[in-house]
Amino acid sequence: MGLRRGANGPPFELSTQTVQGGLPCFLRRIQLKLRTLVLATSLSLGAFASANAGEVLNQIKSTGKLTCIVNPNSPGFSVPDSKGVFQGFNVDFCRMTAAAIFGDANKVEIRGVGFSDSLKTLIAGDAHMASRSITRTGTRDTEPGLSFIATTFYDGQGFMVPKKLKVSKASELKGATVCAEDGTTTLQSLADYFGRLKLRYKVQNIADKSARLQAFFNGKCDVLSSDFSALASDRLLAKNPADFTILADVISNEPLTLVSRPDKELESTIFWSLQVMLLAEEYGVNSGNIDQITANLSAAAPEVQRIFAKDQAGAEMARKLGISTTWAASIIKSVGNYGEVFERNLGKASALAMDRAKSPNRLVKDGGLLYAHPIR
């Protein structure tokens, strides 16, 4: 016998008939339907995840090249040579990734893209990764369509001024007009810094790099503010670089990070390729001795064997990612270890003449911030 809906009752019939376990029949039917729905949903989501796992990496393999975004004109970091081929510190991390995927560092298309368009290009799916001095922030990291992977350069924001202003520290910039790049973390850091000091200032937000530098070099701005690495690079573009000085004040921390489209396999390939470069430097493996070391791995340190031996962790990782088991050796042979990349593009013998011994971008054992995650 059931309870029938009355004038104020629920709009359904509630049966009191029960089954084993004490549940009314109608609740048992609902329970079974819910279980079926949950199982179907789980299977569907599992199939979706499987279908999309490694999708971007597979696309790269099928097209035969990696597409990588860099700054279009940043001496030391990314700049076309006389043949129009991009060279530089950031470019080498594009080449690192291509070497890992294909065993050939040249299977990469380098695209010079302005900052305001770089992340949009990735989100739109028009490139696979970016290596162009992009600061990792919370809001960027949680943006759909982007994966921030690993920091390649620890930087900070600073100021460049004409020497004729005779300014020696940032606290003397009261009332200054500052040229800065629109859409970057630079603007917020300026507001925070000058706000703390209660100093008046004006900002010229100029997205186009050429226009921004022209405004600064021609005296329309008193100050140029950006990451220290960018300021050092930009100063080389002045008619007379010696006319400008970079102040010592650091007003922010800027972890410059490799970014890709979301894809676990691609992210892992990029991340662990960088770890290979760091670990290789730590153990003295470089582009000049890699062949000798891999030919006599039994004499190498266990950590080195784990990277390069075909029956150890590095090779096991490669098989899971679907790349060659010689990926690590290809990276070092084609691009070099992290120290080689730094010195070649940014070090004392380069146009930027950075002293790595005074930089956070050295190994922890040398007093820096860099160390390799364990490959085991």
What are these regions (language model features)?
Residues V108-K120, V203-N218:
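Short helix-initiation/N-cap motifs at beta->coil->alpha
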Residues T67-G76, F86-I101, T135-R136, D155-A207, ...:
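Bilobed "Venus flytrap"/periplasmic-binding protein-like clamshell domains
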Residues R95, A99, G103, K107-E172, ...:
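Acidic, polar ligand-binding/catalytic clefts
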Residues D92-I101, K163-V167, S171, A176-T177, ...:
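Extended ligand-binding regions for polar small-molecule ligands
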